[in-house]
Amino acid sequence: MNASDLIRIMQFGDSVLPVGAFTFSNGVESAIQTGIVHDVATLKGFVLTALKQAASCDGMGVVAAHRAVVADDRDGIIRADWAVNNRKLNEESRLMATRMGKKLAEMSIHVVEHPLISWWLEQIKNGNTAGTYPVTQAVVMAAQGIGQREVVVMHQYGVAMTILSAAMRLMRVTHFDTQHILFELNHDIEKFCDIAEIGDINQMSSYVPIVDVLAAVHVKAHIRLFSN
C-alpha cells in the first residue's frame, strides 16, 4: 500500500470524521442502563458481538457495494444499499445508517470531487436509495481506489470506536481500558474480514435479538444522551 492510500484510509476512517457518529452509541447506552454492560469485560463482550454482527451484515454490504463500483454496476450499488437498510429492524439503526451515510456523501463531494459520489448523493436525495453509511463508505473509498478489505477494516474500526467512545461518557471506564479492548479485538479482524468478503447480500444476517430489544428500551428511555 502506498502512502497516499494509507493517509486517505486514515482520514476517512477517523473517529472524528464530521458525519455525526458522536451522536450515536450503537446500542451501548441501553446496554449500560439495563446493566448488561457494567464493567470492562462486559463492554469488551458487547463490542465483540457488535463486530461479529457487523461483519455478517453491513460488512457484506460494504463488499457487495465495493465490487459493484469496481464493475461499474450502479444498480448493484443500489441493491446492496437496500439490502443493508432492509436488515435493520429498528428505526434507530436505520436512522443512524442513513443519516451518517448522507453526511459522508455530502462531505465527500467537496473533498474527493468524483462523479460517482455526486451521482450517489443525487440518488439519496431523490429517494432512489436509502444511502446507508456502509455502502456510502464503500462508494467513497472505492472511488479513490482503496481495496475492499481495507474498507471492511475501516468499517469494523468505526463500529468499535462508536461504542467505545460512547462508553467513555456513560460508564466508569478509562481511556486505557478502551484502547486495550480495541487492541485485543483487533486480533480477530482477519476473521471478520473473511466473513464480510463473502459479499453475498442474500447471505447477509442481522440476527442479534438483544440489539433490537435494547433499541426498543432506548426509544422509551426517560434519559437519553445518544440518538440510538
UniProtKB/Swiss-Prot annotation:
Supply the InterPro entries for this chain: UreF, UreF_sf
Q: Which GO terms describe its cellular component?
A: cytoplasm
Q: Which UniProt keywords are listed? A: Chaperone, Cytoplasm, Nickel insertion
Q: What is its main location?
A: cytoplasm
Q: Which Gene3D superfamilies match?
A: Urease accessory protein UreF
Instruction: Give GO MF terms, alphabetically.
Output: nickel cation binding
Q: Looking at the keywords, is Chaperone present?
A: yes
Q: Note the superkingdom of the native organism.
A: Bacteria
Q: Write out the annotated subcellular location.
A: Cytoplasm
Do you know which Pfam families this protein is assigned to? UreF
Per the record, the similarity remark reads: Belongs to the UreF family.
Q: What does this protein do?
A: Required for maturation of urease via the functional incorporation of the urease nickel metallocenter.
Q: How does it assemble?
A: UreD, UreF and UreG form a complex that acts as a GTP-hydrolysis-dependent molecular chaperone, activating the urease apoprotein by helping to assemble the nickel containing metallocenter of UreC. The UreE protein probably delivers the nickel.
Report what the protein is called. Urease accessory protein UreF
Gene field: ureF
